[in-house]
Amino acid sequence: MIKQIAIFLENKEGQASACCKVLKDAGVNLYALSIADTKEFGILRILTDNNAVALDTLKKANFLASEVELVGLEVPDEAGALSDLLIVLGDNDINVEYMYSFAGTDGHAKIAFKTGDLQKAISVLEKAGAKII
């Protein structure tokens, strides 16, 4: 399981850079980043090397941030590998709310995704031979 930080940002210029600068100044390294937006606000989702420091720093800088648990997978870097795992989830009535990838090693990609039933997702993926991170 992976713990992500979700940060709500006002949908205007400079918000993402201000958030990232606060983290930089605190010495927090970002492993992955995803931004989703609506007309009024954006959600910056990050994976860091130190969530405790990141959350404390963000809150002190008046950013609305929370920690969210995700399923993390290491997926072979080959055609169809992710598709096969998504089919397993679908066949077990597990919905993926959102997903993003980040750098992997040794010929593997890393995937993080949110679902309503983390334990069920992990269980069915492990039975299918997936490597949970």
Residue ranges and their predicted role:
Residues 1-133:
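A conserved regulatory-domain signal marking ACT and ACT-like small-molecule sensing domains
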